[in-house]
UniProtKB/Swiss-Prot annotation:
Cysteine disulfide partners in this protein: none
Region Hydrophobic, annotated ranges: 240-249
Reported tissue expression: In epidermis, primarily detected in cells of the basal or immediately suprabasal layers (at protein level). In hair follicles, mainly expressed in the outer root sheath (at protein level). Expressed in epidermis, testis and foreskin, and to a lower extent in thymus, spleen, mammary glands, placenta, brain and heart. Expressed in the ovary, notably in oocytes.
PTM remark: Phosphorylation on Ser-537 and Ser-541 leads to cytoplasmic localization.
Name by which UniProt lists this protein: Zinc finger protein basonuclin-1
UniProt biased composition (Basic and acidic residues): 603-614
Subcellular location: Nucleus; Cytoplasm; Nucleus, Nucleoplasm
Gene Ontology MF term list: DNA-binding transcription activator activity; rDNA binding; zinc ion binding
PROSITE patterns per the UniProt record, alphabetical: ZINC_FINGER_C2H2_1, ZINC_FINGER_C2H2_2
GO BP annotation list: cell differentiation; epidermis development; positive regulation of cell population proliferation; positive regulation of oocyte maturation; positive regulation of transcription by RNA polymerase I; regulation of transcription by RNA polymerase I; spermatogenesis
Top-level taxon of origin: Eukaryota
C-alpha cells in the first residue's frame, strides 16, 4: 500500500503510524492498547467488533466510552482558561467522531473545522488519513464509497449521546468554547409546543397543521412549577445543558451536567433538613449514553424537538434489540439539592424575582433570557483576531490592532512571558493539571425516564436521587466572558497541490481525485510553502471591501507612483548603490563573480545588476536557474543602461581597468554632449537619446533596444509591477493581493551600507536612511574606503573620462553627480563636492584639478534657513528659477565661492539650457531619484518642487572667506567656522585627479 508522509510527534502520531501499517479492520486493535473503558466495568483494553468497529467486543461499550479515558475533561465552572490547539489533541478528539464512522454530525463538523483551521494542512491530512478519511469525504461530511469502491446507501454515525460527550471536548479551546456554549443555550431555549396525545391513526397532515397553528398563536404561560408542562426534551439529562456555564460549582467539577427540572431551582431556597450522603465518584461513572454505540445509524435528537412523543431511541447494550418503544416523560421525582446549591443566595434570588436574569460580564439584569442573549451577542460576544506570528496567542478585537501587533518585529511582544493574564493563567492551569493525578469525572446521562439503569447508577445522583452537583435551573443561567473566539479559517488551504489533496489512503483506491464540493482555494491558491500560515480574517474575505480597497490602492498608485513607501526605481541613479540596493548588490556579487580577464564584457545572464533581484534582506526569495535566465533576458530589454555599470571582482579587492585597446572611440562633440546629459539627466537619459555604446563594456547592438518603443513597453509593463519582487500583474488589485500575501511580513533593511537596522515598513526605513546623524560612523568608514574603490558609481564617470580623454579634466562630471568624495570633515561627516566654473568655461571644459577643500558637509538633516537660491542642474533637472547652480572653482582654489547671486566674483553658469533640453527628452513617466534623500518621484515636476522646497534652502556656506564648505544646518556651519584648524589647508595646493 502507499506510504503516507510521517506524522509529527505525540500520541496521535503514534496512532497514525500504527494505522498506516495495518488494514482498517485491524487498526482499532493498535489504537486499543491501554485504552480502558471509562464505565465501571472490568474492560481494560478496547477491542473493536468485527461488524461494528466502534463497539468493544469485550464489554459491549462504545469507542467513545473508552477513548474518553485518554482525554482531559474540562472544568464546568466559569473560566476563561483555554488550551492551545495542538495536532495530537485534535487527533484524539477527531477519533471520537471519525474512527469507524462514515458520517459526521453537523455540529461536530462545524467545531472540528475550527480546530483544523488552526493546524497546518499536512497535519490535517495526516489526521484524516490515519482515521481512514479523505479530505474530500470530510468536506462532504460523509463517505461516498467504501474501501471496495461501492457507493454507500447507509452510513454509520456516532450516537447522539456520544455527540454530546464529544461536544464537551470542544470547551477546552478558545476557538470553539463560545460556539458550544451558544449551542447549548439555543437548544435549551427551544419553545415547548403543547400537543394533545396523539393516536395511532392520526393523519400526518393534520398533525403538522396542528403544530403550525399552535406555534403561530401565542402560547399560554407555562406553569414552571408543574413538571408535566415542561418540554420532555429539557428533562433529558443527555441534552446539552451540561455545557452551560454555572456560577455555583462543585469543588469536584463534574464532567456532564444535566438539565434539572425548573422546580428544583424554585425549591432551592427552602430549607432541607436531610443531609446529603457521601458522593461516590468512580474513574468514569456509569452512563447509558455510551451503551448505544452499536447502532448503525442513530437518529439525531434534534429531529424530535417538535414531537414530544418521539424521544431518541435507546438501545440496551446487552442485547441489540429493535425496540421502537418511545417513552414520554411526564413526572419527575422531587429530590433535594446538595449544599453547594445554596452558595451565594443573593445571586440565586435574581433568578426567582420575576424571572429576571443577569449578565456576568456587566452585572446587568434583563427581563428574560432572550433579551440577555441579544445583549450578550451584541455587546460582549466579539470575534477575536489572533496574532499571525507562530507561537504568539495574543488576540485582538479588530483587524487593525491585530495587524499592527503582528507587523511589529520586536520578538519580545510575541514571547510567552509577555502574553496577557489569560494566557498566563492557561499555562499555570495546564502545568497544574499535568502535575495532578486526578481521575476523569463522569458523564451523567439517564435513560428517557430520567432514571439511571439499575445496573449503572448514575454519578449525578446518589442512592436517594439527590443531585451530585449544583444547578441553578433555567432562570439562573450565567454567561462567561467569551473572549477567545477565532475567525473561521480554511484548513484546506494550499500549499498542497490538488493531487496531494486528493491523495487517499491505500485502502481507498476507488475514490475520485477531487470532488466538486471542494472550494476553489484548493486549485487556484498561489500561496507558497510558508512556516507561518497566512491567516485571513472573516472581514477581509468580503468581496465588496476588497474591491473598494483595490480601487483606492489603484488610484493612489496612479497619483503617487513613488511615494515614501515605494522602493526607489533605479533608472536615474547616481551611483551603484542607487542602481542596485545594497542587498541586491551583495547578492549579485555572490552570484555573478567575474572570472575572466579585465575589462571583459558581461556575458548574457551575468549583468552586474538585476532589478529583478532587488529584495529586502529579510525576504528569502531565491531564483532557480530558469528564473535567473528569464530575468536576465528581461533585463536586457528593460534596463539596457544598467549593463554599463562594471563591478569589481569580489576576491582580493582588485580593480578593473580598461585595456588600451578597448578605449572608447567617441567623437569629442558627441562626448561633450554625452557628458552634459550625464550631468543633467543621468546615465540612462544620455544613452537612450544618443544611442552610443562603450565597446569596453558592451557591444553596441545591445543599445539598439534602447528607444522610445522600449521605454513605452517598460512603462506599460511596470504599470502594475510589484516594487519588491518586480513581478508584473494585470491590474492593481492583483498587485495589492500579491503584496499582502507575499511581502507584508518582510522586513526592510536600511539602505545605508554598514547599517543593519530593519523596519516593518518602507516609510520608516526611508526616514531612518535619510537621517545622516544615525550613520556618521558607517558613512565615514565608507568615505574612507571609497578612495580605493575606483569602480563605485561615484568614480565611474571620472574614470571613463580619463580613459577616453586624458587631456580633458572631467571635473564637473565627477563632482556634479554629488556622490561620496574623498575626505571627511572633522566630525567624520559625509562630504560632497560643490563645483564652480570660471566664466571662460561656459562653452568648453577647462582642465584643472579638483579642490579637496570644496566640500559640502551634510552631517545633519534639520531644517535650514533659506540662504541658498541655487542648486545643481543635475539635482533639479536643469531648471532653477533663480538661474544659479553650484559650480566648482576652475583654478582649484577655494576663493569666491558662493551660492547666492552677487556674492561670487565669477559669473554663475552651468549647462542649464542643454540640461533642460535633455530632461525634456526624458519620458514623462520616468521616475527620478533624489540623490540626497533617496526618495523617488514620478516625474520631473514633482522632483523639481521637492528639491526646491526641501534641499535648496538647506545649504549654509562657511563664513570664513575662501572656505566654500556647505552645511545642511546652521549649527554645523557655525561649529565648522569657529574651528581655525579646519582652515589651515586653504593655503595648500589642491590635489589633482589620480
Amino acid at each position: 500500500m502507499r506510504r503516507r508522509p510521517p506524522s509529527r510527534g505525540g500520541r496521535g502520531a503514534a496512532r497514525a503510524r500504527e494505522t498506516r501499517r495495518q488494514p482498517r479492520h485491524r487498526s482499532g486493535r493498535r489504537m486499543a492498547e491501554a485504552i480502558s473503558c471509562t464505565l465501571n466495568c472490568s474492560c481494560q483494553s478496547f477491542k473493536p467488533g468485527k461488524i461494528n468497529h466502534r463497539q468493544c467486543d469485550q464489554c459491549k461499550h462504545g469507542w467513545v466510552a473508552h477513548a474518553l479515558s485518554k482525554l482531559r475533561i474540562p472544568p464546568m465552572y466559569p473560566t476563561s482558561q483555554v488550551e492551545i490547539v495542538q495536532s495530537n489533541v485534535v487527533f484524539d478528539i477527531s477519533s471520537l467522531m471519525l474512527y469507524g464512522t462514515q458520517a459526521i454530525p453537523v455540529r461536530l463538523k462545524i467545531l472540528l473545522d475550527r480546530l483544523f483551521s488552526v493546524l497546518k494542512q499536512d497535519e490535517v491530512l495526516q489526521i484524516l488519513h490515519a482515521l481512514d478519511w479523505t479530505l474530500q469525504d470530510y468536506i462532504r461530511g460523509y463517505v461516498l464509497q467504501d474501501a471496495s469502491g461501492k457507493v454507500l446507501d447507509h452510513w454509520s454515525i456516532m450516537t447522539s449521546e456520544e455527540e454530546v460527550a464529544t461536544l464537551q471536548q470542544f470547551l477546552r479551546f478558545g476557538e470553539t468554547k463560545s460556539i458550544v456554549e451558544l449551542m447549548a443555550i439555543q437548544e435549551k431555549e427551544e419553545q415547548s409546543i403543547i400537543i394533545p396525545p396523539s393516536t395511532a391513526n392520526v393523519d400526518i397532515r393534520a398533525f403538522i397543521e396542528s403544530c403550525s397553528h399552535r406555534s403561530s398563536s401565542l402560547p399560554t404561560p407555562v406553569d414552571k412549577g408543574n413538571p408535566s408542562s415542561i418540554h420532555p426534551f429539557e428533562n433529558l439529562i443527555s441534552n446539552m445543558t451540561f455545557m452551560l456555564p454555572f456560577q455555583f460549582f462543585n469543588p469536584l467539577p463534574p464532567a456532564l451536567i444535566g438539565s434539572l427540572p425548573e422546580q428544583y431551582m424554585l425549591e432551592q431556597g427552602h430549607d432541607q433538613s436531610q443531609d446529603p450522603k457521601q458522593e461516590v465518584h468512580g474513574p468514569f461513572p456509569d452512563s447509558s449514553f455510551l451503551t448505544s454505540s452499536s447502532t448503525p445509524f442513530q437518529v439525531e435528537k434534534d429531529q424530535c424537538l417538535n414531537c414530544p412523543d418521539a424521544i431518541t431511541k435507546k438501545e440496551d447494550s446487552t442485547h441489540l434489540s429493535d425496540s421502537s418503544s418511545y417513552n414520554i416523560v411526564t413526572k419527575f421525582e422531587r429530590t433535594q439539592l446538595s449544599p453547594e446549591a445554596k452558595v451565594k443566595p443573593e445571586r440565586n434570588s435574581l433568578g426567582t424575582k420575576k424571572g429576571r436574569v443577569f449578565c456576568t460580564a456587566c452585572e446587568k439584569t434583563f427581563y428574560d433570557k432572550g433579551t440577555l442573549k441579544i445583549h450578550y451577542n451584541a455587546v460582549h460576544l466579539k470575534i477575536k483576531h489572533k496574532c499571525t506570528i507562530e507561537g504568539c496567542n495574543m488576540v485582538f478585537s479588530s483587524l487593525r490592532s491585530r495587524n499592527r501587533h503582528s507587523a511589529n518585529p520586536n520578538p519580545r511582544l510575541h514571547m510567552p512571558m509577555n502574553r496577557n493574564n489569560r494566557d498566563k493563567d492557561l499555562r499555570n492551569s495546564l502545568n497544574l493539571a499535568s502535575s495532578e493525578n486526578y481521575k476523569c469525572p463522569g458523564f451523567t446521562v439517564t435513560s428517557p425516564d430520567c432514571r439511571p439503569p439499575p445496573s449503572y447508577p448514575g454519578s449525578g445522583e446518589d442512592s436517594k436521587g439527590q443531585p451530585a452537583f449544583p444547578n441553578i435551573g433555567q432562570n439562573g443561567v450565567l454567561f462567561p466572558n467569551l473572549k477567545t473566539v477565532q475567525p473561521v479559517l480554511p484548513f484546506y488551504r494550499s500549499p498542497a497541490t490538488p493531487a496531494e489533496v486528493a491523495n487517499t489512503p491505500g485502502i481507498l483506491p476507488s475514490l475520485p481525485l477531487l470532488s466538486s464540493s471542494i472550494p476553489e482555494q484548493l486549485i487556484s491558491n498561489e500561496m507558497p510553502f510558508d512556516a507561518l500560515p497566512k491567516k485571513k480574517s472573516r472581514k477581509s474575505s468580503m468581496p465588496i471591501k476588497i474591491e473598494k480597497e483595490a480601487v483606492e490602492i489603484a488610484n493612489e498608485k496612479r497619483h503617487n507612483l513613488s511615494s515614501d513607501e515605494d522602493m526607489p526605481l533605479q533608472v536615474v541613479s547616481e551611483d551603484e548603490q542607487e542602481a542596485c540596493s545594497p542587498q541586491s548588490h551583495r547578492v549579485s556579487e555572490e552570484q555573478h563573480v567575474q572570472s575572466g580577464g579585465l575589462g571583459k564584457p558581461f556575458p548574457e545572464g551575468e549583468r552586474p545588476c538585476h532589478r529583478e533581484s532587488v529584495i529586502e534582506s529579510s525576504g528569502a526569495i531565491s531564483q532557480t536557474p530558469e528564473q535567473a535566465t528569464h530575468n536576465s533576458e528581461r533585463e536586457t530589454e528593460q534596463t539596457p543602461a544598467l549593463i554599463m555599470v562594471p563591478r569589481e571582482v569580489e576576491d582580493g579587492g582588485h580593480e578593473h581597468y580598461f585595456t588600451p585597446g578597448m578605449e572608447p572611440q567617441v567623437p569629442f562633440s558627441d562626448y561633450m554632449e554625452l557628458q552634459q546629459r550625464l550631468l543633467a539627466g543621468g546615465l540612462f537619459s544620455a544613452l537612450s537619446n544618443r544611442g552610443m555604446a562603450f565597446p569596453c563594456l558592451e557591444d553596441s547592438k545591445e543599445l539598439e533596444h534602447v528607444g522610445q518603443h522600449a521605454l513605452a513597453r517598460q512603462i506599460e509593463e511596470n504599470r502594475f509591477q510589484c516594487d519588491i519582487c518586480k513581478k508584473t500583474f494585470k491590474n492593481a488589485c492583483s498587485v495589492k493581493i500579491h503584496h499582502k500575501n507575499m511581502h507584508v511580513k518582510e522586513m526592510h533593511t536600511c539602505t545605508v551600507e554598514g547599517c543593519n537596522a530593519t523596519f516593518p515598513s518602507r516609510r520608516s526605513r526611508d526616514r531612518h536612511s535619510s537621517n545622516l546623524n544615525l550613520h556618521q560612523k558607517a558613512l565615514s568608514q565608507e568615505a574612507l574606503e571609497s578612495s580605493e574603490d575606483h569602480f563605485r558609481a561615484a568614480y565611474l564617470l571620472k574614470d571613463v573620462a580619463k580613459e577616453a580623454y586624458q587631456d580633458v579634466a572631467f571635473t564637473q562630471q565627477a563632482s556634479q553627480t554629488s556622490v561620496i568624495f574623498k575626505g571627511t570633515s572633522r566630525m567624520g561627516s559625509l562630504v560632497y563636492p560643490i563645483t564652480q566654473v570660471h566664466s571662460a568655461s561656459l562653452e568648453s571644459y577647462n582642465s584643472g584639478p579638483l579642490s579637496e577643500g570644496t566640500i559640502l558637509d551634510l552631517s545633519t538633516t534639520s531644517s535650514m534657513k533659506s540662504e541658498s537660491s541655487s542648486h545643481s542642474s543635475w539635482d533639479s533637472d536643469g531648471v532653477s528659477e533663480e538661474g544659479t547652480v553650484l559650480m566648482e572653482d576652475s583654478d582649484g582654489n577655494c576663493e569666491g565661492s558662493s551660492l547666492v547671486p552677487g556674492e561670487d566674483e565669477y559669473p554663475i553658469c552651468v549647462l542649464m539650457e542643454k540640461a533642460d533640453q535633455s530632461l525634456a527628452s526624458l519620458p514623462s513617466g520616468l521616475p527620478i531619484t533624489c540623490h540626497l534623500c533617496q526618495k523617488t518621484y514620478s516625474n520631473k515636476g514633482t522632483f523639481r518642487a521637492h528639491y526646491k522646497t526641501v534641499h535648496l534652502r538647506q545649504l549654509h556656506k562657511c563664513k570664513v572667506p575662501g572656505c566654500n564648505t556647505m552645511f545642511s544646518s546652521v549649527r554645523s556651519r557655525n561649529r565648522h567656522s569657529q574651528n581655525p584648524n579646519l582652515h589651515k589647508s586653504l593655503a595648500s595646493s589642491p590635489s589633482h585627479l589620480q
